[in-house]
Curated annotation (Swiss-Prot):
Transmembrane segments: none annotated. Antimicrobial peptide. Active against Gram-negative bacterium E.coli (MIC=12.5 uM) and against Gram-positive bacterium S.aureus (MIC=12.5 uM). It is found in: Secreted. Belongs to the frog skin active peptide (FSAP) family. Brevinin subfamily. It comes from Nidirana okinavana. The keyword Secreted applies. Keywords: Amidation, Antibiotic, Antimicrobial, Secreted. The lineage of its organism: Eukaryota, Metazoa, Chordata, Craniata, Vertebrata. This is Brevinin-1OKa. GO terms for biological process: defense response to Gram-negative bacterium; defense response to Gram-positive bacterium; killing of cells of another organism.
Amino acid sequence: FFGSMIGALAKGLPSLISLIKK
């Protein structure tokens, strides 16, 4: 469970950062 959650975070973080840095 936690493994998949960390995977989702790892996938979501880059997109969030790119949105903030836009």
